[in-house]
Amino acid sequence: VEAFFACQYAGLVAVPLAIPMGVGQRDSWSAKLQGLLASCQPAAIITGDEWLPLVNAATHNNPELHVLSHAWFKALPEADVALQRPVPNDIAYLQYTSGSTRFPRGVIITHREVMANLRAISHDGIKLRPGDRCVSWLPFYHDMGLVGFLLTPVATQLSVDYLRTQDFAMRPLQWLKLISKNRGTVSVAPPFGYELCQRRVNEKDLAELDLSCW
């Protein structure tokens, strides 16, 4: 999240990419990452410590490509530069399609399009209200995770409770318990998210949930 907003301030194009969800996906993810990097040709990659070996393997330790962990990134000294205010048609970020039917394609998102999307979600769609509280387990490389539950709450100054996607996959009812406990009013998921909860829930779980706030 910090790296994404740092790119916006610095006038750089952010490219959020997926991480492997399971141990068995790492080899296929590494091959997929090579294709994505060849497509977007980044100048730098910022990733978590646990993914550094995989990223370095995918990039073949290319000396021309800066690969940083989050800790290294945060430790960099602050540069004394004049930040440029973005204009509406500047590129805000590059978002890749899911790749469910073909190899993911990068879609250019401008600042104008981001703001239009935020307004459509907050004012025309969900119609957010002061005091709403969001809950999400959607990953930030996912359009609804990034725009719906990161950028929209920032733009509308709402609180958000985040559950790691991996934690939801292992214990989906944690999502519903988080909504119940913190009185979340806004939360969405793809159909499989609801189906996963339905398969895992039992009568005891239902008795402990109060989703009337949602």
What are the roles of these predicted feature ranges?
Residues 30, 38, 50, 59-68, ...:
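Conserved adenylate-forming
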Residues 115-133, 143-185, 196-203:
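Conserved AMP-binding/adenylation subdomain of ANL enzymes
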Residues 9-78, 84, 190-191, 196:
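Structural core segment of the AMP-binding/adenylate-forming
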Residues 1-22, 35, 39-44, 132-133, ...:
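A short helix-loop-beta submotif of the ANL/AMP-binding
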